[in-house]
């Protein structure tokens, strides 16, 4: 399985139309501030990603707009195009009360992973009995200088939106990226849930990674990358 994952990354770098990372094997991944393991969830092989032991105790980091972690996909390379992935996420057992099951994708990650743009969902907000929480169901942010709290304070409502979500249910995410523009489609909807026209890191290239926030248990399956124009 490891060879298949590496082959996908190698072929993608040569410009092959669409490459698949099945996410059914755990070797070769590069986790940062999270744990990753193979799992079976609701009848599907997947990888399970959770925050490191003790990370929830530092939940104030998340509240101040930082925190979370990534799992870099080996030899992935991405500039413009589409990212498709299935994710199922929820707050983990004993997570802080304000945990929402934060999970999504980081893209254009440099080798040192010191900065990246990312987009994610908050599954427990999707059907909350509170309109403001519903409006915060999907989020774009950029690590480390434009995290969610900063963006919300400076541009309320611009980088997050509502989408119907169910905690723990498999949810399909499709992310379209072109230059400094990003579109997020959820569950194969014909119209995007979230539109961003000013990606904070600009028009760059890098790796792709699975992303979760603290207090999260998330499962990822069948990630595909398709370069623009292929």
Regions found by a protein language model. Give the residues of each.
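Boundary at the C-terminal end of the N-terminal hydrophobic targeting segment
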Residues: 7, 13, 17-18
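Extracellular glycan-recognition regions
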Residues: 17-230
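Sec-dependent N-terminal signal peptides
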Residues: 1-5
